[in-house]
Amino acid sequence: MAKEELLELDGIVDEVLPDSKYRVTLENGVVVGAYASGRMRKNHIRILAGDRVTLELSVYDLTKGRINFRHKDANSPRPPRAGQARR
């Protein structure tokens, strides 16, 4: 059996929810629920509200997606690094 086809879409994180879940607005205006992929959790990649992300959506359920990539924008906020004091 072949692996199911996935749709790759870009969106912007609107809200960070508990349990590593997010509310994302896609480029076409549709709002979907999403979760961070295992690779992103393993590498401690932080996703904040306002970040531009790439999602994978199943063709069977277009209301939930998996965040695969957080785009690096020059104006996106950066979380403080561990061990550094804020000034």
Curated annotation (Swiss-Prot):
One of its GO terms (molecular function) is rRNA binding. The keyword Protein biosynthesis applies. Transmembrane segments: none annotated. It is found in: Cytoplasm. CDD domains: S1_IF1. Its main location: cytoplasm. One of the essential components for the initiation of protein synthesis. Stabilizes the binding of IF-2 and IF-3 on the 30S subunit to which N-formylmethionyl-tRNA(fMet) subsequently binds. Helps modulate mRNA selection, yielding the 30S pre-initiation complex (PIC). Upon addition of the 50S ribosomal subunit IF-1, IF-2 and IF-3 are released leaving the mature 70S translation initiation complex. Belongs to the IF-1 family. Component of the 30S ribosomal translation pre-initiation complex which assembles on the 30S ribosome in the order IF-2 and IF-3, IF-1 and N-formylmethionyl-tRNA(fMet); mRNA recruitment can occur at any time during PIC assembly. This is Translation initiation factor IF-1 2. It comes from Burkholderia vietnamiensis (strain G4 / LMG 22486) (Burkholderia cepacia (strain R1808)).
